[in-house]
Amino acid sequence: CKNIKYSKVLPKASVVVIFHNEAWSSLLRTVHSIVNRSPPEYLHEVVLLDDFSDQDFLRENLKAYIADTWPDGIVRLVRTTKRSGIIRARIAGAKAATGDVLIFMDSHCEASTGWIEPLLSRISENRRKVVCPIIDSIDDMTLEYSGNGGYQIGGFSWSLHFTFKNGSPRPVESSEYTLPVRSPTMAGGLFAVERKYFFEIGAYDPGMDVWGGENLELSFRVWMCGGQLEFVPCSRVGHIFRSRHPYTFPGNKDTHGINSVRLAEVWMDDYKRFFYMHRRDMLSQDYGDISDRKVLRQTLNCKSFKWYLDNVYPDKFIPDENVRAWGMVRNAESSLCLDTLQKDENTVFDIGMFFCQNGGSASQVLSLTYSNHLRREESCLTTSGQDGSTVQLQPCSYSSNMTWIHDKSNTIVHQASGKCLDTGGGKSEGYVVVNVCTEKPTQKWTMQHYLDL
């Protein structure tokens, strides 16, 4: 990366930093790193937008500090007159900015040396690219910068949460290491976009409230409406990942859930069924008027969500497509179904059993794939195969221990061990096991929907 030479003539950036009651040290660390590590020919301004902070030190003290430290006006302080939330505050920050390119950055970051040139260079090549730096971690306790961003890019879960996924690993010494990596989604706190293009494609959805879902909505919209989203390895920015949520939610509203309904209804077509499978409570939720966003989609002549899945995120697992069967895995004798028991699926854990919810719980939805995996969105069933051993959910792989055979005999057989899935006489909230195959009804299972068996 250090050997790459960039043109002196690149679009100039307005870096937009939104803050609300941010700590003095982390806010100024962010701003100083931007100004100090951005060549002046590329930095038009830093727009520091205060979303109605009520801490005294962020009022006159901050105003005076900015005036004394940057008398040339490179840092501008803009304030909202009421609490807007991160989404509407970013719209306000973008409207206040006058540079060629908008770079949105959270208020608890550190820009690294050489961070801005790769972003501006990529946009200068194609104004329809939205580009993100690689995100390194800053420890939230020690505030130490750790250059561990690696090659992770963005994905999403069907519950419409952002997820990190591994990009194509490239050796650091390879010339290909510096090439941008296409990404289905972005985290949303750190990205660059040409200012006019940002507004051409609809900025943010102003009907979304406070925080949540806006990053996926923008990601889907960019791809579906003719743009591209990339991570740029030679641009690196540190970010403090906090142990608690930095935003307050007026009225304790589930803003992520409500915003995600708006996203699903406008952009996901029939695939919104998977969001509602996870969030049945949102089916009756008032999500406001989305007519303007639907008109925007038509005006921009955007493609379908199926096109997005096929062309941008082809490895995204779809529970009811290209599978043998899917839905509840039910033991008739006990009326128990396999169930995650609401455990964190980013961890490895034993799969449990719970009274069948007849499609009312996403925790009971599994798919039997053509590779004979019994799986969830990212994890597959596996077991050691010993008599009475439990069955775990682990990240899917090609391990033979993850192969299960299910046929019209209604057994589910672990291929590597030849053992059968068995309730073991367990109760609801207990754990399923494998045992030597018999004809016992505790080993008889059916799936809710058979597509090809």
Which positions does each model-derived feature cover?
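Acidic donor-binding segment of Leloir-type glycosyltransferases
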Residues: V35-R79
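The conserved acidic donor/metal-binding loop of glycosyltransferases
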Residues: F52, D106-E110
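A recurrent flexible, glycine/aromatic-enriched loop bordering the glycosyltransferase active site
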Residues: I87, H161-A192
